[in-house]
Each structure stands twice: as structure tokens, then as C-alpha cells.
């Protein structure tokens, strides 16, 4: 078993957003910035920023990893670039105040439509509908989660109506 596989998910997480050199089986060597590690398989996803402004993404299977050596700790700029790598251009960032306003507005809308709604969690950010559906920030139809497809569809339609009415 390799040195990498002997480590656990919390130790693998320490490599995220750092530039590393990975030695894999058959003496293959990879360099790049660690975007993420898989806590189950120990796979590593490396990103390299190319000179033409594009990037390359490489996945290395956890069982093939022999050693991982940190080359560079990275700075805030690199971290931000990696964090927003796969977010779409239309992805909006919301301030805590905006999120609170959206949550309260949606909660009132759902209550007005006689939908039983509660807040759940330590920092009550997630809305819960009848104990079978959750709505996470930023409280859009795509942020709903439920195993009951009928309730999911109806609540998503209500949220869509709310967003249309409030614009």
C-alpha cells in the first residue's frame, strides 16, 4: 500500500489548492494544482493553467498514486481561480443579507400558499417543507431536494411563480 493510500480524507484535504508533484505507478509524474481529492477512492484532480489562458484537468486514480510532494502553497488569487473554475458565468454571488432577504421572502410566499415551512440546521439557512423537502441557499427551484417527485415539482413551480412575481 502506498504512502498516499495510508493517509485519510482529512490528510488528503490538506493538499487542496496547493501545487504538487504526484508520482504514480509506472514512474508517471504529474504536476499541477490540486482541485479536489475523492475521500473514498483517494483520486486526485489536478489543474494546470496554460499560457494561452486555457487549462488542462487531469485525474489520477488513487490506487496508482505513490507519492505527493507539495511544490507551492499557492496564494489567494490561485485559490479563488480554482474555487470558481467550474461555476457558470451566470452564477451570482449573494451577500448574507441578500440570502436572508431571499429566504424570508420565499418563506412568506410559501406560508401564504399554505405550505408548512420550517428552518433547519444550526445556522438556520435551509428551509424544510413538511419534513420531506429542503431548499438550500440561494433558494431557487434548482436548490430544492426531495425524494417525493410530486411535492418537489409542485414546490419548484411555486418558487418559480414567486421569482417571476417578485421581478
UniProtKB/Swiss-Prot annotation:
AD domain location: 69-167
Q: Name one Pfam family in it.
A: Gemin6_C
| Broad class of where this protein is predominantly found | nucleus
Start and end residues of each Sm domain: 7-74
Function recorded in the entry? The SMN complex catalyzes the assembly of small nuclear ribonucleoproteins (snRNPs), the building blocks of the spliceosome, and thereby plays an important role in the splicing of cellular pre-mRNAs. Most spliceosomal snRNPs contain a common set of Sm proteins SNRPB, SNRPD1, SNRPD2, SNRPD3, SNRPE, SNRPF and SNRPG that assemble in a heptameric protein ring on the Sm site of the small nuclear RNA to form the core snRNP (Sm core).
Q: Please give the coiled-coil regions recorded for this protein.
A: none
Please give the PANTHER family that the UniProt record associates with this protein: GEM-ASSOCIATED PROTEIN 6
Instruction: Write down which residues bear the modification named Phosphoserine.
Output: 95, 166
**Name of the protein:** Gem-associated protein 6
Q: Looking at the UniProt record for this protein, which Gene Ontology cellular component terms does it annotate, in alphabetical order? A: cytoplasm; cytosol; Gemini of Cajal bodies; nuclear body; nucleoplasm; SMN complex; SMN-Sm protein complex
User: What GO biological process term is on the record, naming one?
Assistant: spliceosomal snRNP assembly
Q: Where in the cell is it found?
A: Nucleus, Nucleoplasm; Nucleus, Gem; Cytoplasm
One molecular function GO term is: RNA binding
Top-level taxonomic group: Eukaryota
What is its quaternary makeup?
A: Part of the core SMN complex that contains SMN1, GEMIN2/SIP1, DDX20/GEMIN3, GEMIN4, GEMIN5, GEMIN6, GEMIN7, GEMIN8 and STRAP/UNRIP. Part of the SMN-Sm complex that contains SMN1, GEMIN2/SIP1, DDX20/GEMIN3, GEMIN4, GEMIN5, GEMIN6, GEMIN7, GEMIN8, STRAP/UNRIP and the Sm proteins SNRPB, SNRPD1, SNRPD2, SNRPD3, SNRPE, SNRPF and SNRPG. Interacts with GEMIN7; the interaction is direct. Interacts with GEMIN8; the interaction is direct. Interacts with SNRPB, SNRPD2, SNRPD3 and SNRPE; the interaction is direct.
Q: Which InterPro entries does its entry note?
A: AD (IPR047574), Gemin6 (IPR009422), Gemin6_C (IPR046856), Gemin6_Sm-like_dom (IPR046857), Sm (IPR047575)
Keywords assigned by UniProt? Cytoplasm, mRNA processing, mRNA splicing, Nucleus, Phosphoprotein
What is the originating organism of this protein?
Homo sapiens
